[in-house]
C-alpha cells in the first residue's frame, strides 16, 4: 500500500530553531596566553654588600620571613633562611612562629618580653 498523503496537500514548512538555544556549533573558546614571569636571578652566596645589608636593614623590618628577605635582598630562599638563623643565634631577631613550612621572625626589642596587664 502506498503511504497516505496529507489531505491539505504539500509539505509542512520546516520548523525554525530559535537563535541562542543550546546545541549547534558555538564559537570555540581560545586559550588565553599565560602570564610570563621574568626569571629571577638571585644570588647563591652572600657578597659583602648584601651581608652588611642583612645586618643593618633586615633587623629593622617588622615582619621577617625568608621569602621577604629573599625578595628584598635578591638572594635565594635557602640563603635567606641561613642568614635569619644566624641573626637569631646572635639575638638580633626573635622567632615568633616556627611552622614546618614557614618561619616568622620579628625584630628583637630592647626590653625582655614584658607583658602589661
Curated annotation (Swiss-Prot):
GO cellular component terms, semicolon-separated: cytosolic small ribosomal subunit
Family classification: Belongs to the eukaryotic ribosomal protein eS25 family.
Highest taxon in the source lineage: Eukaryota
InterPro entries, alphabetized: Ribosomal_eS25
Organism (species): Caenorhabditis elegans
Keywords per UniProt: Ribonucleoprotein, Ribosomal protein
GO molecular function terms attached to this record: structural constituent of ribosome
PANTHER family: 40S RIBOSOMAL PROTEIN S25
Disordered, as annotated region: 1-34
Protein name in the entry: Small ribosomal subunit protein eS25
Skewed-composition ranges (Basic residues): 25-34
Amino acid at each position: 500500500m502506498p503511504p497516505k498523503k496529507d489531505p491539505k496537500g504539500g509539505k509542512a514548512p520546516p520548523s525554525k530553531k530559535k537563535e541562542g538555544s543550546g546545541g549547534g556549533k558555538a564559537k570555540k573558546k581560545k586559550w588565553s596566553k599565560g602570564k610570563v614571569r621574568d626569571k629571577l636571578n638571585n644570588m647563591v652566596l652572600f657578597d659583602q654588600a648584601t651581608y652588611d645589608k642583612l645586618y643593618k636593614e633586615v633587623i629593622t623590618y617588622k615582619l621577617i620571613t625568608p621569602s621577604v628577605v629573599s625578595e628584598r635582598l635578591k638572594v635565594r630562599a635557602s640563603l635567606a633562611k641561613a642568614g635569619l638563623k644566624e641573626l637569631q643565634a646572635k639575638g638580633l631577631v626573635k622567632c615568633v612562629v616556627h611552622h614546618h613550612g614557614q618561619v616568622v621572625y620579628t625584630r628583637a626589642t630592647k626590653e625582655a618580653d614584658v607583658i602589661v596587664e
